[in-house]
Amino acid sequence: MNKWGVGLTFLLAATSVMAKDIQLLNVSYDPTRELYEQYNKAFSAHWKQQTGDNVVIRQSHGGSGKQATSVINGIEADVVTLALAYDVDAIAERGRIDKEWIKRLPDNSAPYTSTIVFLVRKGNPKQIHDWNDLIKPGVSVITPNPKSSGGARWNYLAAWGYALHHNNNDQAKAQDFVRALYKNVEVLDSGARGSTNTFVERGIGDVLIAWENEALLAANELGKDKFEIVTPSESILAEPTVSVVDKVVEKKGTKEVAEAYLKYLYSPEGQEIAAKNYYRPRDAEVAKKYENAFPKLKLFTIDEEFGGWTKAQKEHFANGGTFDQISKR
């Protein structure tokens, strides 16, 4: 072997030795399985190309509130990708995430958005067109439990906001409306994917209140001949949020790759993957490319209608809040 061949052999051997094997844990909310299965492959390839290191990302899924509790209780998540900011704040309150986490990434650390829509059976036999149809007698509604599910809290607040707008912002009338809606709920699963399975696989209910991405997944990939999506006249802008878990990445030495993992969600490839998985992308060019995939509707925000997540959580979902009040039979 000539000297160039020997040198190349040593170089390749040195590169092989220097390449690291890294493992991350992404603790996410219920219906993001398909999104992150695709995204993880793309990021791993990107990181390998950039650094030569091998990164494997493990996933954990469940109701967003339950997932936040698991991180608070010690599960060593490098990153969390949860349904709403309050759940990340809850982890930050326990000192595992920096309290200024929401400022670390663009768009308040929400790299994609969604909203809340209805999934009905083919032909829409109960003629469900808007939120007011969900309180009619004989309509069986499926939605998760707001005590454990982030999506369920978005569902609840979307209904509440609609009721406010149609009752001159009368909170008492909004509470009566939401109480009537939940009287029609047949099954309260712990997470959004569980509710989808109840509706789609078990055949229970006339209408599923769902994340838009979950409804599109069910309709487009599980049975266009079985289901239809109904987009209400208005709904809430749902903003799932992401953060590095500071205490864990500092302990494991994974901060650099964990931060890069979340930042890459904002890249053109990350945004494209989000859009293909039925999430509304933030990137203007990607959003324009997929604009026909997402119906236009009036969207209100958690800050506009409810004064932010801390206030909404306290008033509606804490012990003794409005959800507990309307749940009393």
Curated annotation (Swiss-Prot):
Keyword Repeat carried by entry: no
Chief place where the protein resides: periplasm
Cellular localisation: Periplasm
Pfam families in UniProt: SBP_bac_11
Entry-linked InterPro entries: Sulphate/thiosulphate-bd_CS, Sulphate/thiosulphate_BS, Thiosulph/SO4-bd
Record carries keyword Signal: yes
Gene Ontology MF term list: molecular carrier activity; sulfate binding
UniProt protein name: Sulfate-binding protein
Alphabetized UniProt keyword annotations: Periplasm, Signal, Sulfate transport, Transport
Signal peptide: 1-19
Cited function: This protein specifically binds sulfate and is involved in its transmembrane transport.
